[in-house]
Amino acid sequence: MKEGLKILMSVLVSSDLSRAIRCIKTCLLQTEHNLDFQTYVVINTQDKEFERKMAEYCNWSGIDYEITESDGTASTGKNSVFEVFHKKKEFTHLIQIDGDDFLYPTFLRHIERHLTKYPNTDVIGILPCDSIYMNYEEGFHKLNNGIYAGLWGTNYSSWYDWIPFEVDSIFSDKCTGNLARLMLFSRSIPNKFFYDKEQVIGEDYKIHFDLLFAHQRDEITYWLSSASDTWVRDTTSFGVQKQESNCVVDGEYIIRRNDEFQERLKSYIEKTNGVYRSGSGELPIDFAPLYMGVERKISFLNNIL
């Protein structure tokens, strides 16, 4: 085991039992690493039947879990994971993954590599992130079950569009949103940073700015990683933000841009740190090796989906 590191891999679940179980299984399928880790399920839901079935599955599988109080917002669920991690002092780092997403088997291999090379890291965001979709777009790969995968390799040319210096894209007509998935937190983060439950759409985006500004003040160290063979985002699920958006395009629910939440976040940025230096181009980027190429990714996705 990697000396001095102990990882709490927390799966946050609120609905959709089959996706939640899929996520848990991918946490347990990690390969080629030497990290001491525990998979831990946080059940944060208002659906009592789902709560019962999820607890039943965890008991049957021998997986530790905790039921936390839910108000129906994604922020409250994610903050409850922070609270669990804060209580579990034996763990050095937290991985917080939404139960409708899932991991490649090389995820922990990347975490180990990064923390070995950059041990003072407090936050890692993965960008770009592989995703699965209901509808086809140019460049997507069709999977056996009829859905499509948008997969990244080692082409970094698009980073110039996604990682703006100076001013974030939220202040332009072509807001790209926060495309990064926050995949690792050190013990420095919980109890100091929180997801805002008033930011019903874009809570990840808002905490990104809090972390970015803290990085600029030299209070924490926030990295972006190019390791696309880590996390898979499932855009076919029907989560809280899609329910709030209630927007269907080509038969698929999407998270619609919400002007109220967008303007609230812009105002927050202006008051907190100012428009300038709001771009994430100041964050260091770890151009990580790719352990899983496209063909291996497709094979894994066809087996897990």
Pin down the residues of each PLM region:
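Acidic donor-binding loop at a coil-to-helix junction in glycosyltransferase catalytic cores
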Residues: 200-207
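Short, well-formed alpha-helical segments that are part of the catalytic scaffolds
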Residues: 16-30
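Active-site donor/metal-binding and catalytic loop motifs
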Residues: 221-255
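A recurrent flexible, glycine/aromatic-enriched loop bordering the glycosyltransferase active site
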Residues: 157-185
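Short beta-strand-to-loop acidic/aromatic patch adjacent to the donor-nucleotide binding site
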Residues: 91-102
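Short beta-strand-to-loop element that shapes/binds the nucleotide-sugar donor at the catalytic cleft/hinge
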Residues: 124-141
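Glycine-rich, basic loop-to-helix element that forms the pyrophosphate-binding segment
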Residues: 69-86
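Acidic donor-binding/catalytic loop of UDP-sugar-dependent glycosyltransferases
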Residues: 101-114
